[in-house]
């Protein structure tokens, strides 16, 4: 079964863990580059989807770059409405491949990350990340795709799973996220192998705190 992973540097951190946990029954592909923000991912799909074999399953996320505060005067890098518009378009293009789609919520940052103002490095606020997660989940509510709630699993003990840079996962975080992604992929793969005529797949790891 062929799997395509799409995302930013968080995806790049957990990629090897996903490959290890999926084993030889799955071929895992991903762009070599960082998927960055939603508009960049949307534009890049024109090239990425031609670069790899047609996938059976696609697991994707964008959001950390979109919620980044590059300059304190400007707020989030992309407005939530533009983020949602881009994510809808990304989902449309991914669905057109015929693959089973899994969407992952954006992961939290350390509470201290808000204090890093200015152009380098950007600041993030968990309230913004949660707000963008809610917005995209509301937009995807009728799309009938599984949700892998990485935010919900990581947020309660985020400091345990974050590295010193306060945004990327440490070893424990890689194990957590990689395990969740691999498990979601296996469950969707098994589900559709056994019930290929079913109308919908179950939601995965969905935490109510994300959408409140």
Describe each model-derived feature in a short phrase.
Residues 1-16, 37, 67:
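Catalytic nucleophile-elbow at a beta strand-turn-alpha helix junction centered on a G-D-S/GDSL motif
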Residues 5-8, 34-37, 79-80, 124-125:
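Short, flexible loop segments at the rims of nucleotide/cofactor-binding pockets, characterized by
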Residues 6, 31, 104:
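The conserved SAM/SAH-binding core of class I Rossmann-like methyltransferase domains
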Residues 8-11, 34, 167, 174:
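Short beta->alpha junction loops/turns
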Residues 14-26:
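A short, Lys/Arg-enriched amphipathic alpha-helix followed by its capping loop at the start of a domain
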Residues 21-24, 42-212:
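Alpha-helical cap/lid subdomain in secreted, periplasmic
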Residues 25-42:
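A short beta-strand-loop structural module common to alpha/beta enzyme folds
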């Amino acid at each position: 079964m062929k799997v395509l992973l799409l995302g930013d540097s968080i995806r790049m951190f957990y990629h090897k863990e996903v490959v290890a946990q999926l084993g030889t029954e799955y071929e895992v592909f991903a762009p070599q580059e960082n998927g960055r923000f939603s508009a960049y991912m949307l534009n890049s799909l024109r090239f990425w989807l031609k670069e790899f074999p047609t996938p059976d399953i696609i697991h994707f996320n964008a959001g950390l770059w979109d919620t980044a505060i590059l300059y304190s005067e400007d707020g989030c890098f992309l407005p939530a409405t533009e983020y949602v518009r881009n994510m809808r378009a990304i989902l449309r293009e991914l669905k057109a491949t015929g693959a089973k789609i899994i969407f992952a919520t954006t992961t939290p940052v350390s509470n201290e990350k808000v204090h890093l103002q200015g152009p380098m490095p950007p600041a993030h606020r968990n309230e913004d990340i949660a707000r963008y997660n809610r917005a995209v989940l509301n937009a995807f509510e009728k799309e009938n795709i599984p949700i892998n709630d990485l935010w919900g699993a990581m947020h309660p003990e985020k400091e345990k799973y974050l590295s010193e840079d306060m945004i990327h996962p440490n070893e424990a975080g890689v194990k957590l996220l990689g395990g969740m992604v691999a498990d979601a992929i296996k469950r969707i793969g098994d589900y559709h192998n056994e019930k290929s005529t079913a109308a919908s797949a179950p939601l995965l790891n969905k935490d109510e705190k994300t959408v409140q």
